[in-house]
Amino acid sequence: MATEKISPGMQQYLDIKKDYQDAFLLFRMGDFYELFYEDAVNAAQILEIALTSRNKNSENPIPMAGVPYHSAQQYIDVLIESGYKVAIAEQMEDPKQAVGVVKREVVQVITPGTVVDSSKPVGENNFLVALDRQEQAYGLAYMDLATGEFQVTSLADFDQACGEIRNLRAREVVVGYCLSEDEQQILSKQMNLLLSEVEEAMEDVQLLGDELSSLEKQTAGKLLAYVFQTQMRELSHLKKVHHYEIKDFLQMDYATKTSLDLTENARTGKKHGSLFWLMDETKTAMGGRLLRSWIQHPLIDKGRIIKRQDVVQVFLDYFFERSDLADSLKGVYDIERLVSRVSFGKTNPKDLLQLASTLSHVPQIRSILETIESPALESLVARLDAIPELENLISSAIDPDAPQVITEGNIIRTGFDETLDQYRLVMREGTSWIADIEAKEREASGITNLKIDYNKKDGYYFHVTNSQLGNVPSHFFRKATLKNSERFGTEELARIEGEMLEAREKSANLEYEIFMRIREEVGKYIQRLQALAQTLATVDVLQSFAVVAESQHLVRPSFTSSRSLQIKKGRHAVVEKVMGAQSYIPNSIELDQETDIQLITGPNMSGKSTYMRQLAMIVIMAQMGSYVPAEVASLPIFDAIFTRIGAADDLVSGQSTFMVEMMEANRAIRQASERSLILFDELGRGTATYDGMALAQAIIEYIHDRTKAKTLFATHYHELTDLSSSLTRLENVHVATLEKDGQVTFLHKIEAGPADKSYGIHVAKIAGLPTDLLRRADAILTDLENQEKREASLPASRTDSQKVSEQMSLFVEETENPVLTELRDLDIYNMTPLEVMAAVAELKKKL
């Protein structure tokens, strides 16, 4: 980009752009934000706006594009959604009073992680994450600038950090220099995150406190430094950082949350068909965000769970009060985001009126809860701070019909400020005086169509057509000449106009000053408002739980101190709601102290996966504090859920379905405890039959003997059902079918014992495959079944591993193959059987 022979204004642009090379620079020029050079070319394509040029007649015209100032936010949103940063350079002085080039400065850098005013649904958070490392430990901090939420934790490894970032649905990560190049590549390329670097951590005792580890303080400090670097203002709404531990909640990795459709349907990416969709009867944006958080972070503290259940029980018992409560909550606006607008200095009269309206509903909400007189509600009632003095200030000061733009006037109520009322009186009387002058001069001059008009250039003037110019009084003086008329003024009119303009200017300045004082006063209540927002959100979520419990016929679960689990006629509430209660077949499940594993067999499409997901959903709902879909539910409190349900190739990272299966299985058996829940669906199908069966058996044995977690293991390897004879804590169950006259009906009912058939050909028939193809498949199946009767396909016991060994021997026959080097390097004495088998399976692919 050439800098010679350019205007002072363009030199100013280049000087500013030099410091913001990684962002689109929106350069304020009058009523437009202009972009130049490469920014203009790229923005024109992304935003679909016209690309023009500056100095069109020069040899090297400068590419230029612009967006109107008043509608800039929608264009900024598009750039942010596309993954870019946007730097806003504002005019720092009135162009009319500027000497030379108008002073301009960047006042804010908006990024995917710091955007506040956007089209993002108000029921969702927008988290900015920071990630750093000290030795082998990782620090992770996150913040939502729109709500002020600020959290930090320490993590054991990079995989765990990536999982937490995925759970937060972050789009931008502030990284420290301690992260390796490979780690940064994974974040930016595989996870498609915008990475932003910060050199020094910020030290803020008020926000960071002195209770964090050095790693956590460093990570949270870098996040703060980045936020203040980009926002360039005081952010009084930021909450003091809260330290949390992953282990304080029911642990679920991103794959588990995705496969269980917790907050969105994995297939459609939409809310419909998710647990959040089922549970969301909230009335406020704050409640919606809190519900989403509770779904993703179920509790493991029995006391906290029961406290939530107690409130839900109260709301179920008091239907009419709950209905009144819901109606009152509908009048509650998004306090958290209103507070952030105060902190950002972006509050308009509408925001303050919404805040006052919300505060006016709090006494009613409190009264409803007090009427119930339940100990379960006492702590919530105590935290419902209506802040009446703030509501009175706003209600008495802000006009209900005030415009959103604070410089347009008519913001402050009449009667709030005596001086302002005097200015307004002068303006009103001036209008009356002008009408009197018009009538007086019309009568004196005899000009019947004489009238007084106004425009910004000429001010107030008498409008006289050319045909009446001969009747113009001598005390009129000419102000402007037009084609068919002329404009005149008088000393009296000029005096009245001067008084009115002075009053209007002083009124506008005073109104702005009063509004700023009120906004500053509101800022003093930020912490109390945030505490109120949290309480209202909690009340909202718990009343939502009660509404769903009633409409979906849920029951209150109990929790045992043992590891036994009993669910009578359990249901998958989301599936039930989608398909209708009349069509859904409930299933019971019992895993007592002596049973850890259920091996599930049965036809494809018969309901094995739904049965497994049903248990996970009931556990999650119970530990959220919600009621659950069953007739009776007695559960232990689980510390983690691990799943492998469904298979989708990870094409981005180049990992096969089988490799993903093995990684998820490894995570489960390594991290699960006796108080965990494992759900494995058709594990091993991503590789050859014998490999898959061997791995499945080894995994089952490992869980049975060492992990001892409660496990549902669905398999198409019917030979594995023989394991019940040697594994005492394993039981077989199957999905029942009805076969009559060659027709098969899936009953979707779980029964004891193994299945005897897979009915895969019947599923193919349902899918509509050609009849002759199905006949051929049936014939082949008959031949294979006859052959199977003559062969054993499963080791009789865990000590008889000859067949598995024979299958594995295929990998070592080619002695000259370079894969042998990798095989020799395997540290098998420090690997689990599963890791050995997975590694060998990967080596097999290289042969």
From Swiss-Prot:
Residues given in the record as ATP binding sites: G602, P603, N604, M605, S606, G607, K608, S609
CDD domains: ABC_MutS1
GO terms under cellular component: cytosol
Region (Disordered): 788-807
GO terms, molecular function: ATP binding; ATP-dependent DNA damage sensor activity; damaged DNA binding; mismatched DNA binding
Compositional bias ranges of the Polar residues kind: 796-807
InterPro entries: DNA_mismatch_repair_MutS, DNA_mismatch_repair_MutS-lik_N, DNA_mismatch_repair_MutS/MSH, DNA_mismatch_repair_MutS_C, DNA_mismatch_repair_MutS_clamp, DNA_mismatch_repair_MutS_core, DNA_mismatch_repair_MutS_N, DNA_mismatch_repair_MutS_sf
Keyword Nucleotide-binding: yes
GO aspect biological process, one term: mismatch repair
Swiss-Prot/TrEMBL keywords: ATP-binding, DNA damage, DNA repair, DNA-binding, Nucleotide-binding
Family membership noted in the UniProt record: Belongs to the DNA mismatch repair MutS family.
HAMAP family: MutS
Entry function: This protein is involved in the repair of mismatches in DNA. It is possible that it carries out the mismatch recognition step. This protein has a weak ATPase activity.
Protein name, as recorded: DNA mismatch repair protein MutS
Source species taxonomy: Bacteria, Bacillati, Bacillota, Bacilli, Lactobacillales
Gene: mutS
